[in-house]
């Protein structure tokens, strides 16, 4: 079967002033997604995408690099101000927020939206190292 050549969609440059930066920080990785106010994705990045593998993905430095990469993508679309929503218990939370501020995006609000169970499912067993 013949494959089509060069039929990929071109990325349309949007002009978005304000957005929401969703930082999902787990124990193993940090994901940053920058959306517009409605929730449509503008830019995203993660520690794994940038080449960090294994235990290096969970470091604050990897979260900082991922945050800078996502912020640069969003600024190409004209973004200037962001609200930050942080979710999860990971180590890259603060460094990701700081990296957003240093790249030139103005952070207007920081919200912690970590889901807290009302005694939901049983947590994983304690590690014995």
UniProtKB/Swiss-Prot annotation:
It comes from the Bacteria. Part of the 30S ribosomal subunit. Interacts with proteins S7 and S18. Binds to IF-3. This is Small ribosomal subunit protein uS11. SUPFAM superfamilies: Translational machinery components (SSF53137). NCBIfam families: PRK05309.1, uS11_bact. One of its GO terms (biological process) is translation. Belongs to the universal ribosomal protein uS11 family. InterPro entries: Ribosomal_uS11, Ribosomal_uS11_bac-type, Ribosomal_uS11_CS, Ribosomal_uS11_sf. The keyword RNA-binding applies. One of its GO terms (molecular function) is rRNA binding. Located on the platform of the 30S subunit, it bridges several disparate RNA helices of the 16S rRNA. Forms part of the Shine-Dalgarno cleft in the 70S ribosome. It comes from Limosilactobacillus fermentum (strain NBRC 3956 / LMG 18251) (Lactobacillus fermentum). One of its GO terms (cellular component) is ribosome. Pfam families: Ribosomal_S11. Keywords: Ribonucleoprotein, Ribosomal protein, RNA-binding, rRNA-binding.
């Amino acid at each position: 079967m013949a494959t089509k050549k060069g039929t990929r969609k071109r990325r349309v440059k949007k002009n978005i002033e304000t957005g929401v930066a969703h930082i999902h920080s787990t124990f193993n990785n940090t994901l940053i997604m920058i959306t517009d106010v409605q929730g449509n994705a503008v830019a995203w990045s993660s520690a794994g995408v940038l080449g960090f593998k294994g235990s290096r993905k969970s470091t604050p430095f990897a979260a900082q690099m991922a945050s800078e990469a996502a912020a640069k993508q969003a600024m190409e679309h004209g973004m200037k101000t962001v609200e930050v929503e942080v979710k999860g218990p990971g180590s890259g939370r603060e460094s990701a927020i700081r990296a957003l501020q240093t790249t030139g995006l103005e952070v207007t609000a920081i919200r912690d939206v970590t889901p807290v169970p009302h005694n939901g499912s049983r947590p994983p067993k304690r590690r014995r190292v």
